[in-house]
């Protein structure tokens, strides 16, 4: 690659650090009285953690103090919100639990917290929420939100796929294939649903 490409990559890295530093300096709380707190913590938190992980391992000019600030933000602002979500009785459609799973995994990787990462993997397989792989996608591929709208269905599937890809990048291929390729079955059902009529069962929360 040319020097221009190198400069652009460095500029993007510096801007990413600037954004992460601004968040870690200013963000002290999510909520606590907004019903969407867990979804916000999942979606925004996973993006911040993924960006921090990339910077941490690819840009030598990031400082230990900056990384420590990002770690503190995730542990004190984002993770407590999701801890509360995971401990609560199921009360949301499954895309929330799927989003929380991918976020927990991203947090665990960046923080090098194996217990946190494993907690997310366990939830993916065995959690009580609508967002686990076997609760979100039935054996025939119908998703928990198929009777709702396709935007949320594909959002939920995408969150589960991101969790699987995260595991794959850690050397774990099993999540993609779990329950006889249940994720693939969900994608196939959803594609057929959007191409024409398919049978489905009404589901409730």
What spans do the regions from the language model cover?
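Active-site/pore-lining binding-face segments in mid-to-C-terminal subdomains
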Residues: 143-203
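Short glycine/serine- and small hydrophobic-enriched flexible loop segments
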Residues: 5, 50-57, 106-110, 158-169
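Solvent-exposed, acidic/flexible segments
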Residues: 13, 34, 38-41, 67, ...
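Long, well-ordered core segments of solenoidal/helical folds
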Residues: 15-31, 69-87, 115-140, 182-198
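Carbohydrate-binding/catalytic loop surfaces
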Residues: 39-51, 88, 99, 103-105, ...
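Extended ligand-binding groove/face enriched in aromatic
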Residues: 5-95
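Short, small-residue-biased leader/transition segments that mark boundaries at the very start
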Residues: 2-7, 204-205
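A structural signal for well-ordered alpha-helical segments within the folded catalytic domains
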Residues: 14-17, 21, 42-46, 98, ...
């Amino acid at each position: 690659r040319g020097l221009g490409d190198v400069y652009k990559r460095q500029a993007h890295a510096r801007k990413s650090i600037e954004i992460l530093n601004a968040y870690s300096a200013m963000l002290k709380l999510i909520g606590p009285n907004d019903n969407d707190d867990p979804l916000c913590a999942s979606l925004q938190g996973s993006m911040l953690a993924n960006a921090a992980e990339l910077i941490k391992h690819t840009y030598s000019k990031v400082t230990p103090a900056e990384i420590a600030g990002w770690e503190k933000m995730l542990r004190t602002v984002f993770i407590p919100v999701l801890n509360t979500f995971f401990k609560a009785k199921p009360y949301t459609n499954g895309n929330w639990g799927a989003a929380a799973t991918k976020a927990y995994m991203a947090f665990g990787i960046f923080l090098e917290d194996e217990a946190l990462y494993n907690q997310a993997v366990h939830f993916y397989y065995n959690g009580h929420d609508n967002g686990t792989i076997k609760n979100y996608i039935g054996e025939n591929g119908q998703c928990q939100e198929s009777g709702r709208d396709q935007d949320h269905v594909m959002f939920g599937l995408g969150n589960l796929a991101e969790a699987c890809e995260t595991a794959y990048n850690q050397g774990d291929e099993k999540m993609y294939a779990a329950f006889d390729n249940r994720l693939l079955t969900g994608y196939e059902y959803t594609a057929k649903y959007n191409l024409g009529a398919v049978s489905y069962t009404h589901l409730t929360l």
